């Protein structure tokens, strides 16, 4: 790094007289106070040290069922394979262990398992790098035992995203088909081991939901989607299609799913709730089950014994059909878990069900289904770790609050609230949890019973931070109305009364940290201001010397002397959403808008400090926190709705 004169780099100015460092975000100066003990030896030219610790992805909470299909399978190893964000997850239910394929750099949209039951293909969307360079959509073929990437297909060929992928089922599975999300929804066939495209063809102007090879005829493919089903023949390097004819049957808005029966018949499920059987090799309907489901048929699965299982959307039913298409048995999935998105055969008579509310269930048509993987359904921002247990809370736009065990990886409890949630914080006793919402309402919940303790409203904008003081005597509530509301707290967090409000920011409150002695707190705002506040009087502290040497209990503010090294060159002030310091004071983790989690040494007070960088999230990473004992880091993905748990090693 070049420095000009004493203490000035391109974007940072060090002033010895003022005892401050000034950085610039969008041309706006952000002055930060240097503690007296560091000032005499401080230099901008000191090299930052990489932390000796690393993060390793330990657990992935969530599943993408909301808008993806046919993405849940049981492997012979006993692992179920599925995806969320940019992670393909291999989850051994018996061993309660996950492995992760991390080869993708943005959202995975589709998944297929090769007939060898070891090789997997996953397709992803187009992304962009931090520098704005496009990351092209592609298919990755990988080994589910070693997790090594075998082949990468279609770089520069696919447009927007790969939405469907499948291996051929006969001829050794040496072909792979894929459909992209270009306007023409191009169907392409690949010799995947050679990474060469055999042929492609425009599929449809409308959305394509499924592309699959016939199980016994390697030259026959089927695609279906919005108001169509096509039967494709692959001959002499050409693809020709025949449209499925609905004739006297009502043409459905969507053909949603397809499977094959032992005799070679094709069965489709559609948005009208009907099952149609298409006779072997033909493009005409030979049998029908009208009204098989109330609402769409979202999933079809042919079991090993030849039985057909269907899964319903609106009616949330899983139905077992006899060989004559009479209902043999049916069971309803509980409403909280949502409509069925995909069904996969397990061991014995068990089934795995993925739902549109991003849950995975395990059970059978005879016994019903119980929760295996709980997911959030919408954008996720709220995260807080319990002060003395291996637990954390997540809450989001879906109005759900989950208290999780980081050891069992299951919710200890879940509850819905009336408003979309934005922020969370535990009382130091751990017995009460505050949750801030987007409406200005905030709640206190009992951590053990999940009962509502109290509900308050401050302003009518979103509550971006709720934070109890370390001694448990105050609660600070930071709002998008530019104010911080301060409450005194009694009865271990169960009783609060408004003390006053802190007025002085000219933009919304983004982050807040308390002093270790609970006398004051510091805030950051949307226009990159750092202000200090006296808790007892709610007055702004304007004297630099009063706050320069304060020991802060936490480091969640993204602007401040101890953390400013997290900002990359040319950063926009909104590029980093959250930061957290380990309780032992040695590590700092940041969450950015580019799907990355960075691990720094603390304090992080050299410009553009060195970090270890980790992918896994696919959209902006919205929040980050250390577990109470610093053994794990938790991160939340915004639109990818996932929570990732990282082991600190």
Swiss-Prot record:
Localization of this protein: Cytoplasm, Cytoskeleton; Cytoplasm, Cytoskeleton, Spindle
PROSITE patterns from the UniProt entry: WD_REPEATS_2, WD_REPEATS_REGION
Keywords: Cytoplasm, Cytoskeleton, Microtubule, Repeat, WD repeat
The protein, known as: Echinoderm microtubule-associated protein-like 2
Domain notes: Contains a tandem atypical propeller in EMLs (TAPE) domain. The N-terminal beta-propeller is formed by canonical WD repeats; in contrast, the second beta-propeller contains one blade that is formed by discontinuous parts of the polypeptide chain.
Protein's job: Tubulin binding protein that inhibits microtubule nucleation and growth, resulting in shorter microtubules.
Single GO term (MF): tubulin binding
Positions of the UniProt region annotated as Tandem atypical propeller in EMLs: 10-649
Family of this protein: Belongs to the WD repeat EMAP family.
Tissue specificity of this protein: Widely expressed in both brain and peripheral tissues, including brainstem and enrichment in the postsynaptic density, PSD.
Gene Ontology annotations for the cellular component aspect, listed alphabetically: cytoplasm; microtubule; mitotic spindle
GO terms classed as biological process: microtubule cytoskeleton organization; negative regulation of microtubule polymerization; regulation of microtubule nucleation
One family name in Pfam for this protein: Beta-prop_EML
WD repeat spans: 56-93, 97-144, 151-192, 195-234, 241-280, 285-323, 369-406, 410-447, 452-489, 495-535, 564-602, 609-648
Matching SMART domains: WD40
Assembly with partners or alone: Interacts with GRID2 and may also interact with GRID1. Interacts with EML3. Binds unpolymerized tubulins via its WD repeat region.
Main location: cytoplasm
